[in-house]
């Protein structure tokens, strides 16, 4: 369904004043009739405050990628990692600026509709496909967390070794959780109160951050011994290779696993499909105000990511894994609470992520069709089976972070916003050789290079077996 203002019809106003109004106010080009109330974007006046919009966008940014950031720091060094993280944050903010500019000109409030405005129906299909792939990757990362953490939690409560009993195998448990919990929730016709789980997810990740900081000061250097384990148990999954026995932090380092670090960071900052819906709901919407929302949200997540990665790395140094929770003692009470909170959050988030995938598939494959329960159920079943098979076959969550962070993440952050800007902003307003369009072009080229280099190094690691030899 087209989401454009009929008065604008996706066309640029003839007068420059109208264009400036759209850039700054996200408003129709013509002012309201005398004595009437000003009409906000899309004839809808948002009621969400600035602070709540920041919270909503922070929820959209926050995800499972935070669990892999300490691993990324271990393979880049503290200073190099923080510099790369800052660059990704700044580039994400710039790409949101491009999206808001395009949306203001075209009068569109959906990422997919920008694709249609730029390239017609084919553009909408491409954008929807990229978003679906990214959400499938997010679902896979959530289910992988269940696969790796749920056996430890159940084994702790039952005083059993999670590696010894068949009913504690992660592959079996994710199938059980998918059938008994996720599938019934995914079959709901509307999200309802499931939409509030994003707030729960952010709360759980804040709890995770506080716990990581606390455990750093409690453990000191956790290399070679485990001060939190009960009855002198070893750290769960602590690798014996590559330990930094001196507990010295590396400021700059480069190794074969660095090909995963930037994709993990890119994966952690993707929020772009949710920017325009949040913009629509914003009270007193303007481009400048929404950009401020984005900057505050990205800045807050940068601080949270930086703290989590730094304290996680300074606890385990070069031995840290891509799924950092696996580094802590299985029986530590605080970490057990963190595991339970994270498991609850990711389990309830999976059906929330599944809803937009199903909606996009129905719009692409069955446009104009009335609601059908058999189709509704079939799409949910196929998606869950596909994701479960993917999670069972993939050896580490790092591979999920790496592949999605190297494909859909640069597409959503770098490539698509720059292409939209080049196609949607008319040459009468910004000539192709103007500095803003040259910047956008370079931004898109950077995204293509980032994708090619990351995928190239990852495939090389897989081909040479260095990924398995790393012990992660």
Swiss-Prot record:
Cytoplasmic side: 1-48, 109-125, 188-192, 279-295, 356-376, 421-439
Substrates-to-products reaction catalysed: L-serine(out) + Na(+)(out) + H(+)(in) = L-serine(in) + Na(+)(in) + H(+)(out); L-alanine(out) + Na(+)(out) + H(+)(in) = L-alanine(in) + Na(+)(in) + H(+)(out); glycine(out) + Na(+)(out) + H(+)(in) = glycine(in) + Na(+)(in) + H(+)(out); L-glutamine(out) + Na(+)(out) + H(+)(in) = L-glutamine(in) + Na(+)(in) + H(+)(out)
Residues annotated as glycosylated: 226
Disulfide bridge partners, by residue number: 221-247
Tissue expression pattern: Predominantly expressed in stomach, brain, liver, lung and intestinal tract.
Membrane topology of the entry: Multi-pass membrane protein
Topological region Extracellular: 72-87, 147-166, 214-257, 317-334, 398-399, 461-472
Annotated Gene Ontology cellular component terms: plasma membrane
Activity vs pH: Optimum pH is 8.0.
Activity control summary: Not inhibited by lithium. Partial allosteric regulation on ions sodium binding.
UniProt keyword annotation of Transmembrane present: yes
Known function: Symporter that cotransports neutral amino acids and sodium ions, coupled to an H(+) antiporter activity. Releases L-glutamine and glycine from astroglial cells and may participate in the glutamate/GABA-L-glutamine cycle and the NMDA receptors activation. In addition, contributes significantly to L-glutamine uptake in retina, namely in ganglion and Mueller cells therefore, participates in the retinal glutamate-glutamine cycle. The transport activity is pH sensitive and Li(+) tolerant. Moreover functions in both direction and is associated with large uncoupled fluxes of protons.
Protein name according to UniProt: Sodium-coupled neutral amino acid transporter 5
